[in-house]
């Protein structure tokens, strides 16, 4: 199990981006969150099996999301097992 935290910049607030991430994350069997940041970016935290996390990160990086993704910066960590669902914050 792994976790990644990604900062997604672009036109990602007010366009359904967080709902998209939550839905995709749940379909992949992940837990985590998608949170609006004050600078207009969205922070995505996802945890679960590495292949599923890589699939979600790939979706974020390819730009096939609501709005427009200009940049994705991700940091990988060991899973912390402190999350129970995928939430939109």
Curated annotation (Swiss-Prot):
Catalysis performed (reactions): an acyl phosphate + H2O = a carboxylate + phosphate + H(+)
Stretch forming the signal peptide: none
MF annotations from Gene Ontology: acylphosphatase activity
Gene3D superfamilies associated with the record: 3.30.70.100
Keywords for the protein's UniProt record, in alphabetical order: Hydrolase
Domain of life according to the entry: Bacteria
Sequence ranges assigned to domain Acylphosphatase-like in this UniProt record: 3-89
InterPro entries attached to this UniProt entry: Acylphosphatase, Acylphosphatase-like_dom, Acylphosphatase-like_dom_sf, Acylphosphatase_CS
EC number(s) recorded for this UniProt protein: 3.6.1.7
Keyword Hydrolase found: yes
Active site feature: 18, 36
Entry similarity comment: Belongs to the acylphosphatase family.
Protein name: Acylphosphatase
Organism the protein comes from: Frankia casuarinae (strain DSM 45818 / CECT 9043 / HFP020203 / CcI3)
Gene name linked to the record: acyP
């Amino acid at each position: 199990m792994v976790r990644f935290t990604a900062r997604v910049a672009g036109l990602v607030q007010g366009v359904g981006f967080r709902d998209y991430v939550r839905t995709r994350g749940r379909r992949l069997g992940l837990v985590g969150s998608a949170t609006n940041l004050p600078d207009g970016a969205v922070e995505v935290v996802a945890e679960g099996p590495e292949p599923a996390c890589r699939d979600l990160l790939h979706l974020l990086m390819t730009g096939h999301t609501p709005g427009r993704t200009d940049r994705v910066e991700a940091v990988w960590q060991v899973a912390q097992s402190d999350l129970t669902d995928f939430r939109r914050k």
